[in-house]
Amino acid sequence: MNSKAKKRVVLPTRPAPPTVEQILEDVRGAPAQDPVFTALAPEDPPDPSPRAEDSEIQQEQIYQQSRAYVAMNERLRQAGEALRQKFDGLRQAGQRLEQDISQVTSATS
């Protein structure tokens, strides 16, 4: 009368995975309109011959991006140098402060 004691259902064994040859045969035999090939395809294929105007615009955009990158790189280099100089100044000020503190403590002793 124990309802918790149910019989276990024995599942069939798993089939072996397909071999590479079987997969390739399946892919080669699939039609071109198979959802596997069309699901991720773009709706409109890109124009095979881009217009010269589009190419020039794209080249100009890339050129401007390159110029902006070079300018930003130079600004970062300058900022790094300024930061190093300020760090050195603070370190020297800290050393002077320690010297002054030691002089004051030795003078008061």
Curated annotation (Swiss-Prot):
**Domain of life assignment:** Eukaryota
Extract the InterPro entries matched here: UPF0449
Q: Which family does it belong to?
A: Belongs to the UPF0449 family.
Coiled coil spans: 73-104
Q: Which keywords does the record carry?
A: Coiled coil, Phosphoprotein
Would the keyword Transmembrane helix be found if you checked this record's keyword annotation? no
In residue numbers, the region (Disordered) covers: 30-62
Residues spanning the signal sequence: none
Amino-acid biosynthesis keyword on record: no
The modified positions for Phosphotyrosine read Y63
Q: Report what the protein is called.
A: UPF0449 protein C19orf25 homolog
